């Protein structure tokens, strides 16, 4: 049995890609997207028809060019998502504009709009996850959206504090970023030789997974942002893992036994009182890595969102 099939015995595998052909090849349960992946896929000629449809939609649904570009971007994200849902049996994650990461109300408004666009294409709400950055405002937006039956994927998650706040808000799923945590520590104190058990990104997800299971939180833990297959194999047993095509390929090509590494702890504890905003901000601020990577992640997604807008604006 190859390693990918071995992992699938214990964990739901998700494709971290907007490349429809690539997703088709690896048979994942779900797929995740973000502005960077959308931008990459939009540059491929085989998806020109999805772009043309989004452009036509933008022209029809915006008065100014700026409004047309925003409308086209939203439609393009949904077009890709709807196509992906034709080949995955589960759900697809679609991201709210990163520039709204500190605006709860506008994040909610954008999320509702994206869901509405999906429903216009005949996609059920249950098959959509709305991705929001794990800021205080993003978590509060998700809390409200969950009450409306809109499931959310809280992304750019780097600290235990963010994970705890998400669970307390009752969000559907979180995406702790293994690789980006590893990158930060590796740049400051390189691990040589590499020991996966000491990988700070892997340890972070394990801690979150154990905490959630010990306190009976139903929020799904989906490890994300992997740099190497060792990180993925070390988290086998996690609820879900979202994996880029290059790593899916490596796992599919290697035949070796896969052992479950994450197992729910038998001991359970009562849940603590929910954190206040002040507690959240203070505790998160104590983690220099998380503060830096969250702000950087928001900036990078915003840059790619603008690039996507420029690409579409040139076609309007």
From Swiss-Prot:
Organism superkingdom: Bacteria
Entry's transmembrane regions: none
UniProt-listed InterPro entries: Aldolase_TIM, TAL/FSA, Transaldolase_1, Transaldolase_AS
Protein transport as UniProt keyword: no
Enzyme Commission designation: 2.2.1.2
GO biological process, one term: pentose-phosphate shunt
Location, primary (coarse class): cytoplasm
Protein family per UniProt: Belongs to the transaldolase family. Type 1 subfamily.
Protein's name according to its UniProt entry: Transaldolase A
Species this chain originates from: Shigella flexneri
